[in-house]
UniProtKB/Swiss-Prot annotation:
Tissue specificity remark: Expressed by the venom gland.
Protein name stated in the entry: C-type lectin mannose-binding isoform
One GO molecular-function entry: metal ion binding
Domain C-type lectin: 33-155
Sorted UniProt keywords: Calcium, Disulfide bond, Glycoprotein, Hemagglutinin, Lectin, Metal-binding, Secreted, Signal
Length: 158
């Protein structure tokens, strides 16, 4: 019985330590997720300036990339909690060659999409950057002109 309690207690401590390891290194107000830290910035910037801001913030940082429904839901909840103004939020997906080939700014695989219905539509042949759509609760994406000014979310490793 004593050995069982010791093993159970050890497993609980280990599980707690692993959970803490995921969040130990993110600064306050950053979301820890899958080895990254995410932060929404309320400044309004165009897509390129937002990406450059993330890169200058810390080497290896980029606008956020999203790779699953779970990631999407967690980021949407985080943005809803921490964004101080209403409006759309830039993420790292863009079409730099303007050929309708979407890539993440961190060069991670483009293996998940959460487009809003009817998107991407490249309205006026001028929509090559992607934001989280506020009216969807930040769960859906919309392509939009890269010069639009929005808040943004950076993804970093600390």
């Amino acid at each position: 019985m004593g050995r069982f309690l010791l093993v159970t207690l050890s497993l609980l401590v280990g599980a707690f330590s692993l959970n803490e390891a995921n969040s130990c290194c993110c600064p306050q107000d950053w979301l820890p997720k899958n080895g990254f830290c995410y932060k929404v910035f309320n400044d309004h910037k165009n897509w390129n300036d937002a990406e450059m801001f993330c890169r200058k913030f810390k080497p290896g940082c980029h606008l956020a990339s999203i790779h699953s429904n779970a990631d999407s839901a967690d980021l949407a909840e985080y943005v809803s909690d921490y964004l101080k103004s209403d409006g759309n939020v830039w993420i790292g997906l863009n079409d730099p060659r303007k050929q309708r080939t979407w890539v993440w700014s961190d060069r991670s695989p483009t293996n998940y999409y959460s487009w809003n219905r009817g998107e991407p539509n490249n309205s006026k042949n001028n929509e090559y950057c992607v934001h989280l759509w506020a009216l969807s609760g930040y769960l859906k994406w919309n392509d939009t002109p890269c010069k639009a000014l929005y808040s943004f979310i950076c993804q970093c490793r600390f």
